Regions:
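Small/polar/charged residue-enriched interaction surfaces, especially the RNA/DNA-contacting tracks
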Residues: 1-286
């Protein structure tokens, strides 16, 4: 990824075409040729789809980093609303669901942002640790942190990568008109009518959630599985309007893969939701 918030789904990109020119900077003529080279000319080198082929190298295909990957598919059990900015033309409800452009799509598609998902997971993880009487220092190790004073403790990058999830399949964008409540009288607040446009799911709507925990420890894996369980059962809503029933998901299928340096092949567990919940090889994870 490029830029900031790479571990929250931002900055992901893909190079579709590579061209490589080689200069030996130890030679005077080569250094001059590099300085005078016209980068706009594309005829000297044939384009390649892979940087490995373009450089003429061979790389190990196996990623040996220790990490736990969770790929889960959910459906919308209730409307979902993650606030975004106003529409470009200004003819939109007061609050609309967040959308993003994707390659191959003619129009922006609704998404589940990595920042929104991370926020609810962080707060639920803190509640779980407090309930169990465990120190919350683990949260800093997993989610990272920045000390506002920048003196007490150095900042730490998040080891949990949360990707943006595209809300795929057919959805309905319906506008709901609401009125603000006067907290003093309990009645309608004068002149506070507003409209919202959440995403309503259908039986075809799915959301794919991708999580990756790098250098995981057993306790951190257990905490992440508890968060997955709460998302799966709809006990952990995401987005706004949770107090009026929005943002609840229903788990359908999940694949948990653990990569370890000491093992030649990764371990994989699957979770499926039918009439009963089925977890493959659950004993080994325990």
């Amino acid at each position: 990824g490029m830029g900031t918030k790479k571990r929250r789904g931002f900055g992901r990109c893909r190079v579709t075409e590579w061209q490589v020119w080689t200069f030996d900077l130890r030679q005077d003529q080569e250094r001059t040729a590099w300085l005078m080279f016209d980068h706009t000319v594309r005829d000297f080198s044939a384009p390649q789809s892979s940087i490995v082929q373009a450089l003429g190298l061979t790389l190990e295909q196996t990623d040996c980093r220790d990490r736990l990957c969770i790929n889960a598919t959910f459906t919308l059990d209730s409307p979902l609303l993650i606030r975004s900015g106003q529409d470009e033309i200004g003819l939109a409800p007061d609050v609309i669901h967040l959308k993003s452009r994707r390659a191959g799509e003619n129009a922006p598609v609704p998404i589940l942002s990595g920042t929104s998902l991370t926020g609810v997971m962080w707060h639920r993880a803190e509640r779980i640790l407090n309930t169990l009487g465990q120190p919350t220092a683990m949260l800093k190790q997993i989610f990272g942190f920045v000390d506002e004073n920048k003196l007490a403790e150095p900042a730490r990058a998040s080891r949990l990568v949360v990707h943006e999830g595209v809300i795929a399949g057919k959805t309905h964008d319906l506008v709901q008109n609401r009125v603000a409540i006067d907290r003093f009288t309990g009645g309608a607040y004068h002149g506070a009518l507003f409209s919202e446009q959440p995403v309503f799911g259908t039986h075809e709507t799915t959301i794919n959630v991708e999580l990756e925990l790098r250098n995981p420890k057993d306790g951190e894996i257990g905490l992440l599985l508890l968060l997955l369980k709460d998302l799966w059962t709809g006990d952990l809503p995401v987005g706004g309007g949770r107090s009026i029933g929005r943002g609840r998901l229903q788990g359908q299928q999940a694949t948990i893969t653990q990569y370890q340096r000491k093992q030649s092949s990764p371990q994989t567990w699957t979770i499926t939701q039918g009439n009963t919940l089925v977890v493959s090889d659950a004993e080994s994870r325990e």
